[in-house]
Curated annotation (Swiss-Prot):
Function statement: Catalyzes the oxidation of either pyridoxine 5'-phosphate (PNP) or pyridoxamine 5'-phosphate (PMP) into pyridoxal 5'-phosphate (PLP).
Endpoints of the signal sequence: none
HAMAP family listed in its UniProt record: PdxH (MF_01629)
Protein name: Pyridoxine/pyridoxamine 5'-phosphate oxidase
InterPro entries (alphabetical): Pyridox_Oxase, Pyridox_Oxase_CS, Pyridox_Oxase_N, Pyridoxamine_oxidase_dimer_C, Split_barrel_FMN-bd
Cofactor(s) annotated in UniProt: FMN
Textual note on the cofactor: Binds 1 FMN per subunit.
Binding-site residues for substrate, renumbered to this chain: 8-11, 67, 124, 128, 132, 192-194
Pathway where it operates: Cofactor metabolism; pyridoxal 5'-phosphate salvage; pyridoxal 5'-phosphate from pyridoxamine 5'-phosphate: step 1/1; Cofactor metabolism; pyridoxal 5'-phosphate salvage; pyridoxal 5'-phosphate from pyridoxine 5'-phosphate: step 1/1
GO molecular-function terms, A-Z: FMN binding; pyridoxamine phosphate oxidase activity
Length: 214
């Protein structure tokens, strides 16, 4: 057995107090996101862990890139027929997690997910590089394949067929929006007495703010 107990550090970079937070979580998310962007040196600051409940009843988590966020929710794109897409179709309750170690911060978002309008998916797909567009068409995401060579051959054939043509979004690929119902902000603090502030959406769409024990 490898002992990992010596991996530890003290978190001392910031604090999270009720006296300096906004009334809604999206405003605070925007503030933290801009701060991690400005911090520099962090690749793909929009990387998040998306956790869903699979058809087998087990949770599954994977890293996905956040592409937009608004006061309505958080948007990412994927293959609707993938394992992730099938899980979402069966159970729309999912969780998003962000961890920005350099700032000693974590955000956990729980909510319900639904597909965005097709024209929005079309617009984002059009903005992607051609290679990414073709990759979305070629890959039957999450399906078992015999070899990587099969994918590369399919991609080459599709590239040849699409020369000089518009590459349209496949109908089984598009965006989801996660409508938050609960958002927790975690700020590392000394002696493991971390700050945890939770925003919880009430039945009348009012955000209740609570402090949680670390």
């Amino acid at each position: 057995m490898k002992d990992l107990s010596n991996y530890r550090k003290s978190y001392e970079k910031s604090e999270l107090l009720e006296t300096n937070i906004p009334e809604d979580p999206i405003t605070l998310f925007k503030k933290w996101f801009h701060e991690v962007e400005d911090f520099g040196g962090i690749e793909e600051v929009n990387a998040m862990t998306v956790s869903s409940i699979g058809l087998d009843g087990f949770p599954k988590a994977r890293v996905v890139l956040l592409k937009q966020f608004t006061y309505e929710g958080f948007i990412f794109y994927t293959n609707y027929d993938s394992e992730k897409g099938r899980a979402i179709a069966n159970n729309p309750n999912i969780c998003l997690s962000f961890f920005w170690h350099s700032l000693e911060r974590q955000i956990i978002i729980k909510g319900k997910v639904k597909k965005i309008a097709e024209n929005l998916s079309d617009g984002y797909f059009e903005s992607r590089p051609n290679g990414s567009k073709l990759g979305a068409i070629v890959s039957n995401q999450s399906e078992v394949i015999a070899s990587r060579m099969i994918l590369e051959e399919k991609l080459k054939q599709l590239e040849d067929n699409c020369v000089g043509k518009e590459i349209l979004r496949p109908k089984n690929w598009g965006g989801y929006i996660v409508e938050p119902q609960e958002v927790e902000f975690w700020q590392g603090r000394p002696n493991r007495l971390h700050d945890r502030i939770r925003y919880k959406l009430s039945a009348d769409f009012y955000w209740k703010i609570e402090r949680l024990a670390p």
